[in-house]
Amino acid sequence: TYYNIAVSHARTTMKNHFRADYSCYHVIDYDTITGQVLKKNTHQGLAHESAWARGQAWALYGYTMCYRETKLPEFLEQAKKVEQYLFTHKNMPEDLIPYWDFDAPGIPNEPRDASAATVIASALYELSQYDRKNSERYKKNADRIVENLTNSYRTTLNKDNGFLLLHSTGTKPTNVEVDVPIVYADYYFIEALLRKDKLEKTGKLF
């Protein structure tokens, strides 16, 4: 079934995409016949062994979603471990808006990635529903991200071609979409705001 394929895919990704510290690679090349891992890559980050910020954000969001759809504890644990990696990292900025790569050599003088922050915030609001022990911490950090994006990363009304947020980074190694508005940053920003509003009004998301 499609469900079984999705669960198998998520488990294979857990096995092969993640390092011992729960940071993740961007792309894994597999042998299409044997399924053997051929190469572990990070195309949009600094280097293959670096922690590309948006990739880490997708990992948090993705495994939170996997738990929602399956209720399998292994996926919740994976999401929690990715969250711990992110929020204990020495290069996570005070305002919780990540640099484009956690291993970028010029930190603190590196571009931020607001899009990574929006994905993290939205994921944290959902994760707070599944891990009651750490729920308040997740919501507090999500609130901080949303507040800082609103106060310091928001565009000016009727400018910037209708975008909401500035300072996202698409692909820094090739200097494509560096320190610019990006549509998916706005999408996840709106999703995070809607989730924040629903939690405050009803105490639940779903």
Predicted regions and their residues:
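Glycan-recognition and catalytic cores of secretory/periplasmic carbohydrate-active enzymes
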Residues: 1-206
